[in-house]
């Protein structure tokens, strides 16, 4: 955690972005499967 004083490491950005993408895709498919995604 000592490297957070400067630029944010790319692996942290990649991990956060990956989690967000997986979460959004999961919510999208879950909503479509349960019928709630039709309003999106």
Swiss-Prot record:
The keyword Thylakoid applies. One of its GO terms (biological process) is photosynthesis. Keywords: Chloroplast, Membrane, Photosynthesis, Photosystem II, Plastid, Reaction center, Thylakoid, Transmembrane, Transmembrane helix. The keyword Membrane applies. It is found in: Plastid, Chloroplast thylakoid membrane. Its main location: plastid. One of its GO terms (cellular component) is photosystem II reaction center. It comes from the Eukaryota. One of the components of the core complex of photosystem II (PSII). PSII is a light-driven water:plastoquinone oxidoreductase that uses light energy to abstract electrons from H(2)O, generating O(2) and a proton gradient subsequently used for ATP formation. It consists of a core antenna complex that captures photons, and an electron transfer chain that converts photonic excitation into a charge separation. Belongs to the PsbJ family. This is Photosystem II reaction center protein J.
């Amino acid at each position: 955690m000592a490297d957070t004083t400067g630029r944010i490491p790319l692996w942290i950005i990649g991990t956060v972005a990956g989690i967000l993408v997986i979460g959004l895709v999961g919510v999208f498919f879950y909503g479509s499967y349960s019928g709630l995604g039709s309003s999106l």
